Amino acid sequence: GDLFEGQWMTDYRTVSSGYEELLLKPAYRVSASASYRDLSRGLFSHLMIMHHGSESPYKTRRELEDSGLIRLYNDRERSRMRSTMVSGRVNLAIGAIHGGGSLATVYSHTESEAVAEEVAVRYGTDLLTIKGMLNSNITSRLFLLYEMSYNGNRLSLPMADRKPSRLYGMTHALEATYTPVDPLTMTLRGEYYRSRITSDLTKQMVMLDLDLTWSVSRRIDLEAGLHNLLNNDRWDYTTYGLLSRQTVSRQLRGRSLLLTLRLK
């Protein structure tokens, strides 16, 4: 039966200790990794796979009551968690463009259980992160740098009659540094943001920055930075539910000019 015929509460504010400290949770973890490198080609790579799981002899549910957080425990049902993670990274020197690139990714899949409306529900989450970089010294006066990042998540409820939800956010950035004459360096950076906030709402934005540096001497630099050239001053969106509406609005720094005297 239950530990108590009601609520087990040990800390009025956070329930920082309690029933789970009295029990042992069976758990396991298995991992494997491999690396490869070829110095002559400038190739470095690494791959790791890890799988772990645990089992608890009870199910928990959290509820807010007044100013406290209360956990409810039921040891008649067991809960299980399984997770698999794969991560990899590749770095490569590319002589044809006088530069190199890198690609790193992490993927994880987790299956667990939660209590919703007094019913134990199984759910799965997939998380995918990708980061890439490519740089090139096209000439002695022009340097290009491209960076990208992607973060995606997927939530699935096998027991529910609904499609898995997929949300993501990605960023592409291109930076060009040009030195027309030796004392002057110009850097133009463009960024493209795209986010899928809900299944039917996608938000995107472009940002541009320009930086100029004049080397007066070995110890003195004059810098001028013109940021947010397109003057995008807000990142906002509104989502709608059956009986509700939620608006998110974030203030961004508008177009600005920053002058700097740097002493080395």
Model regions and ranges:
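Exposed, low-structure sequence patches enriched in small/polar residues
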Residues: 1-264
